[in-house]
């Protein structure tokens, strides 16, 4: 499958369930992926899961790795929060997309950053995951849909916002099984 061929993406904190699911879908679609992982064990696990289409980096040195690469940046940036993403915006190509993936992205912050980057043609959106199955996540109340979500479901929503929702910016998409429904 080459849905994301010629696409370069950076997934910050990519060894959590959601980040790894995003990276896997990107790699399966033909993208070149840079991924950060905090520990040597996490880096080894991610490298084994993703194969040679992904480069797994230590968070302390990945900005140097980005600067040393051929090319002028990445097309897609996935990060948990604005403070994590902001220092990396210089590595995001004009016309690219930033998707925030933390459970509680503030809608006003997403809209403000979207307005700030609109002049570069960069779209900024967020997914807001609810109760997601993950190792060690413990018991959680079930949402109205009656089950916990899967990291893969959040990854699909994030990739939709990054690649297919080309006229959408400043949006926050709940992926919570109805928990946020009034």
Residue ranges and their predicted role:
Residues 19-20:
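N-terminal Rossmann-fold NAD(P) dinucleotide-binding loop
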Residues 118, 123, 168-170:
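Short, small/polar-rich loop/turn modules that mediate ligand/substrate recognition or access, typified
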Residues 8, 15-16:
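Conserved glycine-rich cofactor-binding loop
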Residues 123-133, 162, 174-176:
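Conserved SDR Rossmann-fold cofactor-binding beta-strand/turn motif
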Residues 72, 147-175, 180:
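C-terminal substrate-recognition "lid" of short-chain dehydrogenase/reductases
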């Amino acid at each position: 499958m080459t849905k994301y061929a010629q696409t370069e993406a950076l997934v910050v904190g990519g060894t959590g369930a959601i980040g790894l699911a995003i990276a896997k879908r990107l790699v399966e679609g033909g993208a070149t992926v840079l991924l950060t992982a905090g520990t040597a064990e996490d880096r080894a696990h991610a490298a084994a899961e993703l194969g040679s289409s992904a480069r797994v980096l230590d968070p302390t040195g990945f900005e140097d790795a980005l600067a040393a690469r051929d090319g002028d940046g990445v097309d897609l940036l996935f990060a948990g929060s604005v403070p994590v993403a902001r220092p990396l915006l210089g590595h995001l190509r004009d016309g690219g997309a930033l998707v925030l993936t933390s459970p509680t992205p503030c809608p006003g912050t997403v809209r403000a950053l979207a307005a700030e980057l609109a002049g570069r043609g960069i779209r900024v959106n967020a997914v807001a995951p609810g109760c997601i199955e993950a190792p060690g996540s413990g018991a959680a109340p079930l949402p109205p849909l009656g089950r916990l979500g899967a990291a893969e479901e959040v990854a699909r929503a994030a990739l939709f916002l990054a690649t297919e929702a080309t006229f959408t910016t400043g949006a926050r998409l709940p992926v919570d099984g109805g928990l946020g429904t009034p």
